[in-house]
């Protein structure tokens, strides 16, 4: 059953990493344009020990017009808190802490209206600002 379900689900739904764009060694070049999605998957893996990765699906959206044309940016589609327990703030720049806190603020502002009081309080705690 598990094998059938997995295969059926794979064939029924869009594949998260389908092209035409790909970030890999052997690929066909394709432009990134608004409306496409990519995944942002930073992580670290210690051989034989452990690993951790966060993953967000990002939407490509227009950012600004310049004399060189339109610039794009990535906007997160998946809004999940990032666990602060494993973060060593002394290894982060001020800019990285600002990004992290702005991301968590967005997570809270987008998700909290859909939650009950208990869930909202939990989300408020886990998305509270990261401090040094």
Question: What name fits each language-model region?
Answer:
Residues 9-10, 14-132:
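Charged, cofactor-coupling segments
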């Amino acid at each position: 059953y598990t094998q059938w379900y997995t295969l059926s689900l794979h064939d029924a739904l869009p594949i998260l990493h389908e092209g035409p764009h790909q970030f890999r060694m052997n690929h066909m070049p394709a432009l990134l344009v608004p409306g496409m999605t990519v995944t942002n998957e930073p992580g670290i893996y210690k051989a034989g020990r452990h690993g951790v990765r966060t993953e967000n699906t990002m939407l490509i959206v227009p950012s600004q017009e310049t004399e060189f044309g339109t610039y794009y940016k990535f906007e997160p589609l998946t809004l999940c808190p990032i666990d602060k327990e494993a973060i060593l703030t002394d290894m982060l720049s001020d800019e990285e802490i600002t990004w992290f806190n702005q991301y968590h603020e967005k997570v809270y502002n987008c998700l909290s209206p859909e939650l009950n009081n208990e869930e909202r309080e939990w989300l408020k705690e886990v998305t509270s600002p990261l401090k040094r």
